[in-house]
C-alpha cells in the first residue's frame, strides 16, 4: 500500500483520464440522465433525491465501452498503488447533483452502507466536470488507515435520506479539481459533498474495488459484483 494512501486515506491522480475515456463517461452519464428521475430508488437504494441527487447505478454492462473501462489496465494503475493487490470491481454508479438544487451529502464512510463486516475497499471518484466548492465538490477528512481502520458509528438522517458519521467542526479538505481528475479513497475515509448552487449539473462517476469478493457472511451471497480487474503490464 502506498505510504501516502495509508497515512491520509486517499490519493489524488491529476489528469488521470484520456480525453476518450472522459468523453465516454460523460456520454453514458448523459444518456442515463434521459431516463426518468425516479431511477429505481425505491427498489435499489433509498438515498436518491430525484433531480436534486441522482444515483445512476449498476449499468456498466449496458455500455460496452464502460464495461471495458471499469476492469481495464487503466483502472489497475489507479487501484493497485492504493490496495497493493489484484482487485475486483465491487460497485459502480454515476452521481449527479442537479443544477441550482443539487443536494449535499453528509459525512460518511462508504463501508457504513454495506451492512455487514468486510475488508476495506477503494472508491475511485472521477470528476466528469470541473469540480468546485460552488457545485458540490467532495470533502475528505484525512485518516491514518494503519492506526484508525474501523467503521465509525453512523446515524440515519430521515429528512435527507442519508447516513451521517461525523458531527464535528472540521470542514474537511475540498477536492477542487478539473474534469478528468481521480480521487481514490478508502471505504473507511470520512467524506461528504456540498450542494450544487450553480446553473449546471455536477457529474461524477464512482467505481469501487475490493481485494476480494464481498459476500454476506451469513448467507454467502455476493454483494453486487466481483469482476476481476486486468493487471497492467
PLM regions: where:
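Non-heme Fe(II)-dependent double-stranded beta-helix
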Residues: 1-8, 14-107, 113-116, 153, ...
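Non-heme Fe(II)/2-oxoglutarate
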Residues: 32-47, 156, 182-184, 189-233
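Double-stranded beta-helix
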Residues: 133-192, 210, 214-216, 227, ...
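Active-site region of the double-stranded beta-helix
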Residues: 85, 109-116, 128-137, 145
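Short, conserved beta-strand element in jelly-roll/cupin
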Residues: 115-133, 176, 208-213
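Active-site glycine-rich loop that binds ribose-phosphate moieties when present
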Residues: 105-109, 126, 165
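Conserved hydrophobic/aromatic beta-strand scaffold that supports enzyme active sites
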Residues: 10-12, 123-127, 172-174, 182-184, ...
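Glycine-rich phosphate/pyrophosphate-binding beta-alpha loops
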Residues: 110-112, 121, 192-196
Amino acid at each position: 500500500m502506498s505510504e501516502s494512501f495509508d497515512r491520509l486515506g486517499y490519493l489524488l491522480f491529476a489528469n488521470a483520464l484520456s480525453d476518450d475515456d472522459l468523453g465516454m463517461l460523460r456520454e453514458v452519464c448523459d444518456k442515463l440522465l434521459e431516463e426518468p428521475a425516479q431511477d429505481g430508488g425505491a427498489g435499489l437504494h433509498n438515498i436518491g433525491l430525484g433531480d436534486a441527487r441522482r444515483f445512476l447505478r449498476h449499468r456498466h454492462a449496458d455500455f460496452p465501452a464502460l464495461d471495458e473501462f471499469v476492469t481495464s489496465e487503466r483502472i489497475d494503475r489507479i487501484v493497485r498503488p492504493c490496495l497493493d493487490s489484484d482487485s475486483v470491481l465491487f460497485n459502480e454508479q454515476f452521481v449527479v447533483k442537479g443544477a441550482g438544487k443539487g443536494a449535499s451529502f453528509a459525512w460518511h464512510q462508504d463501508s457504513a452502507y454495506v451492512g455487514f463486516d468486510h475488508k476495506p475497499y477503494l472508491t475511485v471518484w472521477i470528476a466528469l466536470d470541473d469540480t468546485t466548492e460552488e457545485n458540490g465538490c467532495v470533502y475528505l477528512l484525512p485518516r491514518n488507515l494503519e492506526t484508525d481502520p474501523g467503521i465509525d458509528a453512523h446515524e440515519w438522517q430521515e429528512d435527507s435520506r442519508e447516513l451521517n458519521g461525523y458531527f464535528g467542526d472540521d470542514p474537511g479538505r475540498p477536492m477542487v479539481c478539473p474534469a478528468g481528475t481521480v480521487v481514490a479513497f478508502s471505504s473507511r475515509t470520512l467524506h461528504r459533498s456540498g450542494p450544487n448552487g450553480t446553473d449546471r449539473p455536477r457529474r461524477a462517476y464512482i467505481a469501487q474495488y475490493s481485494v476480494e469478493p464481498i459476500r454476506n457472511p451469513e448467507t454467502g451471497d455476493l454483494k453486487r459484483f466481483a469482476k476481476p480487474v486486468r493487471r497492467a503490464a
